[in-house]
Regions:
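Substrate-recognition/cap regions that form aromatic- and gly/pro-loop-enriched pockets
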Residues: 1-111
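Activity-critical C-terminal alpha-helical subdomain
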Residues: 90-142
Length: 142
């Protein structure tokens, strides 16, 4: 579909990509889709991918399981809706992909990225004045 991204209007869209373990992926997928349906947030493009074993990088996302990605129209309610969605994700220890993150809380990030402290040690060594930063790094405490 040509120019499919224009379906979301002038404010565009965000992507949410979550990592779901094999043991509860069907339940998490159903609960996720039901959650956004109840909130009247519809994804024109939703993808499901199977992942293999991840790597040892400090902020690595991949791990054995599945990813579910949703494209959601940006609107004034989406941040609040996401905060509620994060509570659902926490029940399943589901990881959110940093590259596609727009709203993840600092606490959720700290709870799900287990090697975060090692990353911070290295960043502090090479950037002690915290010159290298972004909106996301400020929000997540990097």
């Amino acid at each position: 579909i040509s120019n499919w991204n224009n379906l979301y209007g002038k404010n565009g869209f965000i992507q949410i990509q979550i990592l779901i373990t094999e043991k509860n992926f069907e339940e998490v997928i159903c609960k996720t889709l039901e959650f956004f349906q109840k909130k009247k947030q519809f994804s024109f493009l939703t993808t499901l991918k199977e992942l293999g074993i991840g790597n040892e990088n400090y902020l690595s996302f991949p791990s054995k399981g599945y990813t579910l990605t949703l494209d959601l129209k940006m609107n004034s309610n989406l941040k609040t809706i996401y905060e509620e969605f994060e509570l659902l994700l926490a029940q399943y220890k589901t990881k959110v992909y940093l590259t596609k993150d727009s709203f993840m809380s600092k606490k959720y990030f700290e709870d799900t990225y287990k090697k975060l402290n090692k990353f911070k040690e290295i960043k502090n060594k090479y950037d002690p004045l915290n010159v290298i930063k972004s909106f996301q790094s400020r929000r997540l405490g990097l």
